[in-house]
Each structure stands twice: as C-alpha cells, then as structure tokens.
Amino acid sequence: MTVKFGYTILYVPDVRATIAFYETAFGLALRFLHESNLYAEMETGATTLAFAGEEMAEMNGLAIRPLRAGDLAQAVEIALICDDPQSSWDRAVAAGASPLSPPTAKPWGQIVGYVRDLNGSLVELCSDMTAIA
C-alpha cells in the first residue's frame, strides 16, 4: 500500500475571494476552478493547496468550524517556502494579510514569519530548511 500527501483543503466562505487574495498576497497561480466556484486548486508544487466553499463541507456530510478572520486561529498553518521571507511577508501584509510576527531567524537557522489570510488562516512564510539540513 502506498500513501502520499496530496492535498490541503481549506473550507472558506468565498472561494473566488480567497483565490484573488492568494494570487495577490503570495504570488500563487490558479491551477483549477470548478464552474460552481465551490472548489479551486492553486499551483504550489508537489502538494496541492485547495479551497472549497463551506457548502462543500455540508454536501460531503462534514461538520466544520468555519474559518473567520475575527476568531482565534485554527491549530494548523499553511507554510510557504520563500526565497526571501521578508519580501514575501511585506507583500502579503501590503495585500491585506494580518501581520502576526515579522520574519526572524530561528535557533535552527530558518527565517520564519507569520501572517493571517483574509479568512483567518495562519500562513507561515519561511526559508527552505533543506538549505540548512
């Protein structure tokens, strides 16, 4: 049996607004948008970052706690590896991301900063750990 990590799907109140935000704030490109506007995938490399409308959770029989910018962040984050975490953090904040902590050097040598997206999801903007390991 083979298992591989394929998707992270965030259930969001507005898929199209979330796509626009991730394009502007993080420079990600849209890979796929279903005609219903309830599901989209972004170009992110080997693992797919996807957005699904909250209605999709309901359609799939899932009870979820909706993401909301004003609520305490969920205990999960999206980590985006950046060539320049500071520039990426600045771009995200200029695009409307809520700044949490600017990029700083961690004891293990990685540069890490945090923002929240328009829906309140935690987004880590970080340097690549493979350069350190």
Regions found by a protein language model. Give the residues of each.
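Short glycine-/small-residue motifs
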Residues: 122-125
